[in-house]
């Protein structure tokens, strides 16, 4: 089957924003204007197409990023039909993992900001992730019809808070309830959308007289930015010649693709204004799969560099970026095709696990409605039903041309709770449910505590775990009691020691003999976390026994020495020892390694590390003193303060253990007028008195 839409007319984009910037509403409007659904779903009625899990509709927040396909030929039908694949990403900080995954498979992004709230904390996180994957982006300043809306203030914040280089391609005509349309700064015309047909038709008009001066100033800024794209445009501009509309657009597109500028548009999705022009900007300025550099990977040996270009002619390669459980068909694996073609029924290789998988059925999702398709090609995003053993980040490729595309890296969870099934019947279902959820979400871990026998689940924040427990109840009918949240502490050391470990059992018959010297030293935090070096020379310990020493050390790392928390950032070198011809065994050396590490660890100035969170509180000025005082009481370090339209933003670093129940306390301190967000920042050494208390509590158990 031939390709229906040429790959140059594909746009794979993400729509990304802070909670309440109106991102889901914006996506709904896109689906409406591109003719997919004929009745607009409002988020505050709980009817939006993209938010399809029951909890999302209740809480009004987006949790899973649904992928959707639509077609757009421009608001004046000025383009050939373009295929836009949209990935809707969640805005809550406990779900940054979802955002990270989507960024990985996108070619471009639309960042939605609220005209009142501006650039909020989560926007910064998403911005950093987009920078990490070098995703070209444009901004849409939404909610221009709301009280306190100020478009140019948001443009300024993009510069100051995100260190971006914003270039507005539109100006707002009026604001708040007087917001009527936008000025197109490229064409230098005003755009007015018809209210009668929900903004489907529009007219170009002259720019209102009170805006002409401002429009000229920003038009100049825009032309200058476009001219910087190439020497020939610059020469033409400096020579005093007018740049044509085509040249301006071409220059801006080049600079967006190079991540040098971010174009800013505005509107009100709720009032059906501006989304149409933003869609045109997606087509004109964001990249097609062919505009993006080839994706990098390695061959089977794990070292040889290889790449795949966006072309149907190259061998098939795709990246699984999300696993979802669907009530009707079981596992859905969302994947992005980077090169080649695959048909339903084909067998492909999961090169990360080295297992073959058969594509049973392939579906394309429109929010949670699905359409079966027979084939997918380079640039497509689709979901496969029935893949057995694929997890997020795995590569699917042609069996005759294996390649491993870059793996995604996922953060370690920082908070854990114990869950207990309420009845015997729940117990069996719970294991299955947790397994499914962990497969879908790599930032969620499940394990059994060996001492207490309890099932422990860990994730990125309180809301993350609440929603997982809630999903367990709704989707799998498992009722569970949830314990108090526990902090994921870590242990490490501060000095270097050398330590001997000797395990000898010789009392007639076959004995045991293992003897090893280890050097234990601290490593830079944030690196590999653990490294083992074999420095044994002259065969004093035969090399087949050295891996056993490493294994002994690694077992000890899992449950630390100080208080049983995992040990991180240590380097261990085996440099000496001895063995016995008959009595030595792997088991003996494993125990010797474990003993040496345990003793050495306690001599190497062991310390307890605690997770530190980056906290931002937005509060009316009257409560500022109380909020700061409270953060100080929680051992917080204030990083800085900023004025916002509604008061002040306080930024601080606070240990996670002090943040439990903060939402309730903050509400009572500020009569519910303040809001906060937090995300994991780093691990820091816990102060002595805190560490002692934790160690004693753990030992008492």
Curated annotation (Swiss-Prot):
Main location: cytoplasm
Matches recorded under PROSITE patterns: G_TR_1, G_TR_2
Molecular-function GO term, any one: guanosine tetraphosphate binding
Record GO biological process: ribosome disassembly
Origin superkingdom: Bacteria
Matching InterPro entries: EFG_II, EFG_III, EFG_III/V, EFG_IV, EFG_V, EFG_V-like, EFTu-like_2, G_TR_CS
Ligand binding (GTP): 17-24, 88-92, 142-145
Compartments it resides in: Cytoplasm
Keywords: Cytoplasm, Elongation factor, GTP-binding, Nucleotide-binding, Protein biosynthesis
An annotated GO cellular component: cytoplasm
Pfam families listed in its UniProt record: EFG_C, EFG_III, EFG_IV, GTP_EFTU, GTP_EFTU_D2
The keyword Endoplasmic reticulum is assigned to this record: no
Domain tr-type G, first and last residues per copy: 8-290
Keyword set includes Cytoplasm: yes
PANTHER family reported for this sequence: RIBOSOME-RELEASING FACTOR 2, MITOCHONDRIAL, TRANSLATION ELONGATION FACTOR G-RELATED
Family in the record: Belongs to the TRAFAC class translation factor GTPase superfamily. Classic translation factor GTPase family. EF-G/EF-2 subfamily.
Function: Catalyzes the GTP-dependent ribosomal translocation step during translation elongation. During this step, the ribosome changes from the pre-translocational (PRE) to the post-translocational (POST) state as the newly formed A-site-bound peptidyl-tRNA and P-site-bound deacylated tRNA move to the P and E sites, respectively. Catalyzes the coordinated movement of the two tRNA molecules, the mRNA and conformational changes in the ribosome.
Protein name: Elongation factor G
Organism: Sodalis glossinidius (strain morsitans)
Gene field: fusA
